[in-house]
Amino acid sequence: MTRQMILAVGQQGPIARAETREQVVGRLLDMLTNAASRGVNFIVFPELALTTFFPRWHFTDEAELDSFYETEMPGPVVRPLFETAAELGIGFNLGYAELVVEGGVKRRFNTSILVDKSGKIVGKYRKIHLPGHKEYEAYRPFQHLEKRYFEPGDLGFPVYDVDAAKMGMFICNDRRWPETWRVMGLKGAEIICGGYNTPTHNPPVPQHDHLTSFHHLLSMQAGSYQNGAWSAAAGKVGMEEGCMLLGHSCIVAPTGEIVALTTTLEDEVITAAVDLDRCRELREHIFNFKAHRQPQHYGLIAEF
């Protein structure tokens, strides 16, 4: 007997710096409601889905920087998203900037959560592979200061039971690293999902700009195929505060085939019928980890 569900990606168009959280949550609610009307069981939203991508600026005012972070989840503004999800019986994945205070010290993470169909948070992930730089670089048309505004995640790559599926998360740059996928594949993840804010221009290597979409989809397709898992990636896309962000949010099958792909640079919901048992098909007959892996030869991967 197959285990079927409808999976969705809720791509966001650009978020202006002046746009309020209330406005952004309203847009997310529209997509959540749209997805539920189409029979969706779970929807994936982007990285840092509640604000503009603030690491493109160099802030010297700590209070201004802190305004982009969430100190509780859900807070009063975001709570309607959870309540509506529970009313509609639909789960979701949401990315946001997390600020916690431990021992009087502020800690900042690029975070993602899994919420089940009852509106309960059942999983959390903090971005591990932080791209960009730590200090201001004058030559750039925009900054990419994730290494300044976040510390690397400290939760590993957990896999959670979310309603009927085993799910894991990545955030943006994580999708480019095979270790991200393999750890969750070894843990039995059936759906690996996450969000991204990917500029189409990379100032250090502009000769790669024409490959931005290719590398994004290559990472998603290879990760899904080599680990026998469904995957879903939700982008924040379009011209956001002078920076063009990549579209092509997608859903990928365990075979590596793209089964749904966005076609716009604005808020858009795409869906796919997902048979979770197809993961077993790949893991038994092609990537059978127990039968074929030789981990005694892989030590170098964890040493450097």
Curated annotation (Swiss-Prot):
Its EC number is 3.5.1.77. The lineage of its organism: Bacteria, Pseudomonadati, Pseudomonadota, Alphaproteobacteria, Hyphomicrobiales. The enzyme catalyzes the hydrolysis of N-carbamoyl-D-amino acids to the corresponding which are useful intermediates in the preparation of beta-lactam antibiotics. Industrial production of beta-lactam antibiotics is now being developed using this enzyme. GO terms for molecular function: N-carbamoyl-D-amino acid hydrolase activity. PROSITE patterns: CN_HYDROLASE. This is N-carbamoyl-D-amino acid hydrolase. It catalyses: an N-carbamoyl-D-amino acid + H2O + 2 H(+) = a D-alpha-amino acid + NH4(+) + CO2. It comes from Rhizobium radiobacter (Agrobacterium tumefaciens). PANTHER family: NITRILASE C965.09-RELATED.
